[in-house]
Amino acid sequence: MLVARTKKELLDALTPLHTQQRSIGLVPTMGALHSGHASLVAKAREENDVVVTSIFVNPLQFEALGDCDDYRNYPRQLDADVALLEAEGVDVVFAPDVEEMYGPTGLPMLWVRTGEMGERLEGASRPGHFDGVATVVAKLFNLVRPDRAYFGQKDAQQVAVIRRLVRDLDFPLEIRAVPIIRAADGLAESSRNQRLSGADRAAALVLPRVLFDLEERAATGQPLDIEGARAQLRAAQGVRLDHLELVDAATLEPLTVTGALDRPALVVAAIHVGQVRLIDNIELTPR
């Protein structure tokens, strides 16, 4: 397995593979890898000749372009991540620093703007977040030129934004969304889970419980009670609700449903537990 720290090292490794018409799967990550990332790599390994994984904590998608505690405290464990990726059969790891990605200033002159799609839900709480995501992903697509790229369904809005990026900018690749991986207690796997204390993790379990209840209601034809779900999260000790919304599964446009659900939908949510912000979602299928 090659670990490329520069764009030149990456391109030197990939150019012969493109010449040989080997299929390439890209798994973009910010490191602090877990079983959810491993599932992305496994899917990429299954569908491609070559798997490339990027590890880059992207300051552009954090508050104040990374000048914040969330960016500074984001888990970084490159050696452990590289060992995991080698065990999972990854061929190339691209692990640049900020200057390598964005030049001496650490900021690009040109950005991808995601507009209204990137300004609601997660984007309302994290202004500019999806512009930063789309910008770095566009750069990775240009550098790697993958046939397929793999993202976790846990970040449902990110998946929708990236699909739109590919469509609007005519990137010649497929986007694969891989189902959420959950721990035995139901919590969605996330790099941020490392920062939860035992008490915080116990408090956070209210989120999957609320989502599973909504899933059951949809599947059995019961009326959805979105406001009741919000109330449960607001009342939970140690938890602060950011948002919980019912949206169209494809467009993420808000949905208003009275009575039983009559179309596929998604519930997306974010909460704060201690100093950690967690996101989750669940697909709802009507009876």
Curated annotation (Swiss-Prot):
Q: Where in the cell is it found?
A: Cytoplasm
Which GO cellular component terms are attached? cytosol
Which EC number(s) does the record attach to this protein? 6.3.2.1
Q: Does the keyword Transmembrane apply?
A: no
Positions bound to (R)-pantoate: 61, 158
Q: In which pathway does it act?
A: Cofactor biosynthesis; (R)-pantothenate biosynthesis; (R)-pantothenate from (R)-pantoate and beta-alanine: step 1/1
Positions annotated as active site in the UniProt record: 37 (proton donor)
Q: What is its main location?
A: cytoplasm
Return the Pfam families for the record: Pantoate_ligase
- HAMAP family linked: PanC
Fill in the subunit field for this protein.
Answer: Homodimer.
Protein's job: Catalyzes the condensation of pantoate with beta-alanine in an ATP-dependent reaction via a pantoyl-adenylate intermediate.
| Name recorded for this polypeptide | Pantothenate synthetase
What's the encoding gene here? panC
